[in-house]
Amino acid sequence: MSEPQPRGAERDLYRDTWVRYLGYANEVGEAFRSLVPAAVVWLSYGVASSYVLADAIDKGKKAGEVPSPEAGRSARVTVAVVDTFVWQALASVAIPGFTINRVCAASLYVLGTATRWPLAVRKWTTTALGLLTIPIIIHPIDRSVDFLLDSSLRKLYPTVGKPSSS
């Protein structure tokens, strides 16, 4: 999850608790793709996408509760929702889902050509490799998405209330 919060700081339900793991549901679904029906994988994407949407709505709500002139409130809420949604969609769903999918597909292919293991063993090995890859890819993807957004979308935001990449 994230670094420990300073004393008195508000805990973010979507980033500092077990709820954060719902954002990784699709990676788990991708890891199990060779073993479960496609509907289960799509369901895992539904769970992760619901997490992304809930976090974006929560950040917009919190941005709207900050006391300030009404004129800047709408822009601040919009920036909070868009920034959170885009960041989470890329860092929690799209990029890791694609990465785990390709790792598992490549693993299954290599195991099929390089070994004589039974198909069931190859599928379970592929699933294990996919699951083991998840913790390795999280932080590099998060930092890459921070860099991407800092270099593009976040340059378009108004300077007041600009989200930080940390």
Curated annotation (Swiss-Prot):
User: What name does UniProt use for this protein?
Assistant: Mitochondrial fission process protein 1
What stretches pass through the bilayer? 34-54, 80-100, 129-149
Carries keyword Transmembrane? yes
Cited function: Involved in the mitochondrial division probably by regulating membrane fission. Loss-of-function induces the release of cytochrome c, which activates the caspase cascade and leads to apoptosis.
Annotated positions of the N6-succinyllysine modification: 123
Q: Where in the cell is it found?
A: Mitochondrion inner membrane
Q: What GO cellular component term, any one, is given?
A: mitochondrial inner membrane
Family annotation (PANTHER family): MITOCHONDRIAL FISSION PROCESS PROTEIN 1 (PTHR11001:SF2)
Q: How does it sit in the membrane?
A: Multi-pass membrane protein
Please state, per the UniProt record, what induces or represses the expression of this protein. Answer: Expression is regulated by the phosphatidylinositol (PI) 3-kinase pathway.
Q: Tell me the keywords, alphabetical order.
A: Apoptosis, Membrane, Mitochondrion, Mitochondrion inner membrane, Transmembrane, Transmembrane helix
A biological process term (GO) from this entry: mitochondrial fission
Q: What is its main location?
A: mitochondrion
Q: Which family does it belong to?
A: Belongs to the MTFP1 family.
Taxonomic path: Eukaryota, Metazoa, Chordata, Craniata, Vertebrata
